[in-house]
Amino acid sequence: MALRSARGDGPTSGRWDGGAEKGDFNAKRKKKVAEIYQALNSEPTDVAALRRMAISEGGLLTDEIRRKVWPKLLNVNTNDPPPISGKNLRQMSKDYQQVLLDVRRSLRRFPPGMPEEQREGLQEELIDIILLILERNPQLHYYQGYHDIVVTFLLVLGERLATSLVEKLSTHHLRDFMDPTMDNTKHILNYLMPIIDQVNPELHDFMQSAEVGTIFALSWLITWFGHVLSDFRHVVRLYDFFLACHPLMPIYFAAVIVLYREQEVLDCDCDMASVHHLLSQIPQDLPYETLISRAGDLFVQFPPSELAREAAAQPQAEKTAASTFKDFELASAQQRPDMVLRQRFRGLLRPDERTKDVLTKPRTNRFVKLAVMGLTVALGAAALAVVKSALEWAPKFQLQLFP
């Protein structure tokens, strides 16, 4: 059951950052909607263009568009969604009681003012989706916070389509969170401090001295920020971004939040309790579009492959959610980027030109910022690199193309 009657299909990402005049804003929005539908109606579907639209300013704009685009980003066939039979699994599932407790505590994840009967119905559907996915994929292990991701897809897509997308997400982007241990989850968290160190060595050293660790970001990572953000518009905007990008992009976004709060952190007492308390209370008025742009820039500047050695000393440093994608490549026939984009990929993304001036960092000056942080992911070469990386990791179905 999609949530059309409760929230409608208006914009869910709020006004775009930048303070443009209303007329200009509306014109940009109409242009973007037209470009999205042009990509959707291409034969085959222009998934590369859809990824650019999801990353760029404002994201996918409405839940109606998300219902069409999110399945394309995950390469899910919407013509044959799985049957819903989770209710039959409640008595036999070892996870049922924990799932039930978590779902009962999820009241704030539903829109304010939603009729109680409708919310309770959605909570029942949420339980069924989770139990069905776990039953169909016995290698997956439920974790607290998983329901925060599932409910976002349920509210946008409805039960049947949400089941298909979350199942694909669970076996790829979220796979490491669903291991029997937290080892791989902790490894992904280990990317946080190396990213911060590349941009702001003083902030990194302060946090190391405080011994704050990375546990403050655990709920951000494993729920894709769904558990910590109160405005649903911000949550789905981030999901647009994450679904269009490499599976490790959420940890880059976590890093830019910490970097954005640099002065608050440095003004703290340099002890674990003070810094952890500050960082675990995520502000609700973050400049999301700016942070999305910066996260994309940092991913281009410092890709996971370059940070793996710092993230973990052992040779299996790349054993993260990204590793589950290595058997997936999109056939070129499934994509239709135009020649201009191809030329920009070839001409603008030369690592020697993009990185030579910023990889040497002074250890003492916290005001030194990367020039790349000024790039705009929505328009610049960084966006193309992020999309290109996402396409390299994106799922494929043998010879099955999008309808």
UniProtKB/Swiss-Prot annotation:
The keyword Membrane applies. It is a multi-pass membrane protein. Residues 18-27 have a biased composition (Basic and acidic residues). GO terms for molecular function: GTPase activator activity; small GTPase binding. Residues 1-29 are annotated as: Disordered. Pfam families: RabGAP-TBC. The chain crosses the membrane at residues 238-258, 367-387. The record marks Q144 as: Glutamine finger. The record marks R105 as: Arginine finger. The arginine and glutamine fingers are critical for the GTPase-activating mechanism, they pull out Rab's 'switch 2' glutamine and insert in Rab's active site. GTPase-activating protein (GAP) specific for Rab1 and Rab2 small GTPase families for which it can accelerate the intrinsic GTP hydrolysis rate by more than five orders of magnitude. Also shows GAP activity for RAB18 GTPase. Promotes RAB18 dissociation from the endoplasmic reticulum (ER) membrane into the cytosol, probably through stimulating RAB18 GTP-hydrolysis. Involved in maintaining endoplasmic reticulum structure. This is TBC1 domain family member 20. It comes from Bos taurus (Bovine).
